[in-house]
Every structure is written in structure tokens, then in C-alpha cells.
Amino acid sequence: KDRATVHHFLSPDEMAELIGNLAYEYEEEIVERILAEMDPRYAASILAEMHTDDAVDLLSNLDKEQIISYLSLMDEEQSQNIMHLLHYEESTAGSIMTTEFISIAENQTVGSAMKLVRKEAQDAELIYYIYVMDEKHKLTGVLSLRDLIVADDDTMVFELMNKQVYSVKVSDDQEEIARKMRDYDFIAMPVVDFQHHLVGIITFDDMIDVMYEI
């Protein structure tokens, strides 16, 4: 009854934050039980508001029929994005990455890049690192938000970016990634496909549990 009352007073994005915190603090089975008690459309709207990696974590424990049921109630872009991540093999970079990151083009000016950052910052899981891509969406560099803020608006991104950027492939094992992040003190790592296209990021928070196990 108390949970049902909470549902009525919180918006889907507020519930998404609450559910995400519960999943982090407690067993995901408890969160799945809470979702199951909700109206399916409301539960789907909560999953749609969550960061993709968190939504995938919860959905991956459900049976196929339940997954399809929730995805069918989301908008097409969101459901396809989650379905794509669900197809990656468990415990690989692809299965734990989030697609909510900020990327800019290397041929942009700092001024235009900052406009994009301001527009996308609210939905991004991490804004400290800004990843740079070429015209083929291949990862070519990285810079910090501070780099952008202190640079002149007319400076080109390719002049400012650090071209020595460490990345992992979608098929890399999560324990290998955790070791790299721990050894090099990274707070995030970009994930690329086999053509070096930037497809997601993995944050330090996502890897804490894995780091305790290695």
C-alpha cells in the first residue's frame, strides 16, 4: 500500500531515480518486484527514464515475454536502444555500457560544442569527459569540460582535444575493464565497436562491484 501511494506522487523521472538508487542499494529482485506491482505502462515509462545501462540491468533478469511487454510500451527509439544492448553477451563492455554520453565533432568550434553540451548535459550520465568523433563517428579524441569552458569560442575542437584516448571494445570482459580503470584511475572509459565507432561509455560507478571481486 505504501509503495502504491508513492507511485501516485512521483513522476516517472523521479521514480526512475528512486528505482536506480534502490537497485544500487538492494537486490535487483526487490526492484523487479516493485515494478511488477505497477501498472505496466507506468513501469515502462520509468524504465525509459532510467539510464540505459541501469534499465538493461533490470530487464536482463526478466523472461523474454516480460521484456517484450515493457519494450512495446516505450517509444521506438528507446526500445530499440535497450534491445540492442540486451543482445550483447553478459559481462562484456557492450552489456554494461550506457549510451547517454556527450560526443562532439572534431571539426566543430568550441562555441558550437558548448551549445551542444548545454543541450545534452541533463540526460548524460557523465559530463566531465567529452568524447570527440570524426565524420564517420569514429573515436578520435577526448577533452574535459574544463578544457571547453576555458578555451576561446573560435578554437577548433581538433586543436584542443587529446588524441591519446584509451578505449575498450564492446566484446571486452568487464573484469579486464575494471582492472584498467583501477590501474589508470579512470572515472570513465569510452566503448567502441570493431570499426572503432563510439557506441557508449562505462563509468567508474558501474564497475565498483566488479572491482571488489578482482
Task: Enumerate the language-model features and the residues they cover.
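Hydrophobic packing positions in regular secondary-structure scaffolds
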Residues: 1-214
